[in-house]
Amino acid sequence: MKEEKKLLLQEVEEKISASQGFILLRYLGFTAAHSREFRNSLSGVSAEFEVLKKRIFFKAIQSAGFDIDSSDTSGHLGVVFAYDDAVSAAKQVLDFNKQHNDSLVFLAGRIDSANLSGKEVEAVAKLPSMKELRQQIVGLIAAPMSQVVGIMGSALSGVVSCIDQKIQKN
């Protein structure tokens, strides 16, 4: 049994090092169907949900050199490992949570090399994603440009109209 725990610890350490971040959750009233649906929703954002033993998870993050508050870790715990964008994974957890009557509680996390409390992870999940921010920036840049094009177009049509009237008079 000890060898099995060592292998599990090594596997969790590998997942932590391969991920861009992780989110520690407490789950309440999760059925097998909820778990399957949650895992499927996370696969769309390159993340996975694992139910782990507390000791193994905390040993793994300790050996990785991370300091996560373990004071409020009662109940059933699970970890979301985000392999691409940890913020998108946090958003997906928040969306799933809204749809399923707050069956998940954010306990802690690590996003972009920062250790966060559960409330901080939830706050990050509520921020706009990089894609949304890029769209907003493009919109901010495009709006004045389209106004300039409109002004230039109306100025040119005014000049063309004046020339046309001069031609018609002569």
Swiss-Prot record:
It comes from the Bacteria. Signal peptide: none annotated. Pfam families: Ribosomal_L10. GO terms for cellular component: large ribosomal subunit. InterPro entries: Ribosomal_uL10, Ribosomal_uL10-like_sf, Ribosomal_uL10_bac, Ribosomal_uL10_bac_type, Ribosomal_uL10_CS_bac. GO terms for molecular function: large ribosomal subunit rRNA binding; structural constituent of ribosome. Keywords: Ribonucleoprotein, Ribosomal protein, RNA-binding, rRNA-binding. GO terms for biological process: translation. Part of the ribosomal stalk of the 50S ribosomal subunit. The N-terminus interacts with L11 and the large rRNA to form the base of the stalk. The C-terminus forms an elongated spine to which L12 dimers bind in a sequential fashion forming a multimeric L10(L12)X complex. Forms part of the ribosomal stalk, playing a central role in the interaction of the ribosome with GTP-bound translation factors. Belongs to the universal ribosomal protein uL10 family. This is Large ribosomal subunit protein uL10. It comes from Chlamydia felis (strain Fe/C-56) (Chlamydophila felis). The lineage of its organism: Bacteria, Pseudomonadati, Chlamydiota, Chlamydiia, Chlamydiales.
